Amino acid sequence: MAESHRLYVKGKHLSYQRSKRVNNPNVSLIKIEGVATPQDAQFYLGKRIAYVYRASKEVRGSKIRVMWGKVTRTHGNSGVVRATFRNNLPAKTFGASVRIFLYPSNI
């Protein structure tokens, strides 16, 4: 039997983009596992992100739902990236895992 391979890299939803007094929920900050520099983070620009969660009500035979987004640019010097989602991620997802898919590929 063929070995299964993950098509995504794990990441954490850190926070919204913010300043001293104002936060911007349109832009989420994502820390990608194994990425420590802005140069490493460049690879992930344009990649798709999914926040997968379980809901209490079943829709079309499944309780699992997904919120989709995209990596837009890097943020800071520690390899964090900015991402926008079709619907903003709720604040209760701070610290939650997200999946950064390895497509669309630009290699």
UniProtKB/Swiss-Prot annotation:
Pfam family, one: Ribosomal_L35Ae
Main location (coarse class): cytoplasm
This protein's encoding gene: RPL33A
Modified residues (N-acetylalanine): 2
GO MF annotation terms: structural constituent of ribosome
A Gene Ontology term for the protein's cellular component: cytosolic large ribosomal subunit
HAMAP family, alphabetized: Ribosomal_eL33 (MF_00573)
Domain of life: Eukaryota
Entry's Gene Ontology BP terms: cytoplasmic translation; ribosomal large subunit assembly; ribosomal large subunit biogenesis; rRNA processing
Protein role: Component of the ribosome, a large ribonucleoprotein complex responsible for the synthesis of proteins in the cell. The small ribosomal subunit (SSU) binds messenger RNAs (mRNAs) and translates the encoded message by selecting cognate aminoacyl-transfer RNA (tRNA) molecules. The large subunit (LSU) contains the ribosomal catalytic site termed the peptidyl transferase center (PTC), which catalyzes the formation of peptide bonds, thereby polymerizing the amino acids delivered by tRNAs into a polypeptide chain.
Similarity comment: family membership: Belongs to the eukaryotic ribosomal protein eL33 family.
Covalent link (Glycyl lysine isopeptide (Lys-Gly) (interchain with G-Cter in ubiquitin)) residue numbers: 47
Places the protein is found: Cytoplasm
Listed name of the protein: Large ribosomal subunit protein eL33A
Entry keyword set: Acetylation, Cytoplasm, Isopeptide bond, Ribonucleoprotein, Ribosomal protein, Ubl conjugation
Changes after translation: N-terminally acetylated by acetyltransferase NatA.
More info: There are 2 genes for eL33 in yeast.
Subunit structure: Component of the large ribosomal subunit (LSU). Mature yeast ribosomes consist of a small (40S) and a large (60S) subunit. The 40S small subunit contains 1 molecule of ribosomal RNA (18S rRNA) and 33 different proteins (encoded by 57 genes). The large 60S subunit contains 3 rRNA molecules (25S, 5.8S and 5S rRNA) and 46 different proteins (encoded by 81 genes).
